Amino acid sequence: MSIYPNVLLDLYPYCNAHCAFCSYHGKIRHVKPMSEEIYHKVIDEIGNSGECIEIMPYYYGEPLLNPKLFEVCDYISDRAPNVKISISTNGSLLNEENIEKLLKIKTFYFFNFSAYAGTKSTYEKLMGLNYDTLDKIEMAVRRFQSERPDVRLCVGATRDPRFVTEEDSVELVRRFGNIVSFHTISFNSQHGNLNIRTTPQTNPCDVIFASAVVYSDGRVGMCCFDVNGDLIVGDVTKTSLFEALNSDLAQKYRRAHINGLKDVIPICRSCTQPV
């Protein structure tokens, strides 16, 4: 078993989309680009451990906005060769230049395209992007299928009737085939108290065990849905990532989930993430 969960690096927390279901634009946390010192420290630590985990060089932002994205990916591939790089994009910035650079990422493992709706009216309302973004995604998918068959591809979608119609789902499958992956959209109190869970729940959530977030200022969180950083358990500017993830507070949060008491944690109490 790995001593590290999968890690999201909050390298460049800015986004050009306006997804109707996302809490990004309602966040109250101060954001800034992550310093080279912080991400080098985290990547070096994981690389020195020899662990085979996933690193996602983004968090609640569009990774292709980051002018240092490919520099960071090269650093991960060189300093932590056992690590698998996963990237999720809204696709709006996919062009020939960026696709060529993405194709050259050595330890690229998983590439997700957030599409969600297949018709023009729904897509532009839901994502806040131009409909021709789906053409850019299709171009990238074809290139990767041809030139990097080792990279797992996924087109993210939902069948949630609050956001899309059946026609949207059918059109996405028509365009992208079996790489379309439908999932439930999760909400918590950071989404403005809309669509949150109000009934008690005791089943533990796997997210708190399987993922960690290093925020742009170096603080460490335990949940990939925690856009505001409410579940902070340490700070890599003061300790190692391993120490942060095994702090007393981190263990307290995990025990609460294991013991059926996750609802004592405010953000978990409202969360609809399936368990």
Place the predicted regions along the sequence by residue.
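Conserved alpha-helical substructure of the radical SAM core
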Residues: 1-111, 125-135
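Short cysteine clusters
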Residues: 15, 19-22, 205, 223-224, ...
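A short, flexible beta-alpha/helix-coil linker loop
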Residues: 26-29, 118-121, 251
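Secreted/processed peptides and extracellular or luminal domains of membrane proteins
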Residues: 21, 25-28, 211, 229-230, ...
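Conserved C-terminal portion of the radical SAM core fold
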Residues: 6-10, 50-58, 79-86, 107-119, ...
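C-terminal accessory region of radical SAM enzymes
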Residues: 139-154, 174-200, 219-220, 224-275
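Short clusters of hydrophobic/aromatic residues that line enzyme substrate/ligand-binding pockets
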Residues: 34, 94, 123, 205, ...
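Generic beta-structure capping elements
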Residues: 25, 114-116, 223, 236
